[in-house]
């Protein structure tokens, strides 16, 4: 299953994020999203990029807000939303990933008979968000320590919702932390829910639906409800980067 989810690009010396993502097999990404509801980008970020991003967590001027999960019943741990201007790496991921994912999102909407279509450029989609009062950037850094976890949830911040998002693991499993698996659940009509545990290496990203996805059944296309979270961290410290493409009110 892991091999089916993981899509590797061609390795080059010190590639940029744009060239690294261009080398990914996006047809395989789309096939994995259709089959499993998620797909792994590998490589996504270099170890140096991971370390640099994680190190910004304590730099207050880079963020617009901080959330302690236990105060809101979200789980244990904390996260911080970046302020504008976004870090160069985060902005590059958002603008480079969006066109690839918009094509998949439009295909899903067409299959489901939904009228909504997403523009080709992320700037045009953000303009729609901003006209609706969604002006706050949503990319975020998450930090988990021993015993921390993230309850199953959906990242919806207003009327305009881009249906796919990406999480990058910045820490090294085993070396930096144990436990803390990324978990997806799929609630299917008149059926038991299905869970998917997604194993990630440092620098890899997982693409997954924000709230639902179309699935082909014996009677045609139906919609399944999706949630995501993180299992309990057994030891160490775990950092992740969340790339959400719609802005918040």
Question: Where in the sequence are the language-model features?
Answer:
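Fe(II)/2-oxoglutarate
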Residues: 1-35
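Non-heme Fe(II)/2-oxoglutarate
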Residues: 28-126
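Short strand-connecting beta-turns/loops that link adjacent beta-strands
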Residues: 46, 146, 235-236
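A short glycine-rich, His/Asp/Glu-containing loop-to-beta-strand
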Residues: 134-146
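A structural signal for short, well-ordered beta-strand segments
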Residues: 139-141, 166-168, 241-245
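Short, conserved beta-strand element in jelly-roll/cupin
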Residues: 143-146, 159-176
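Histidine-centered catalytic micro-motifs
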Residues: 150-157
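Catalytic core of Fe(II)/2-oxoglutarate
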Residues: 162, 173, 177-249
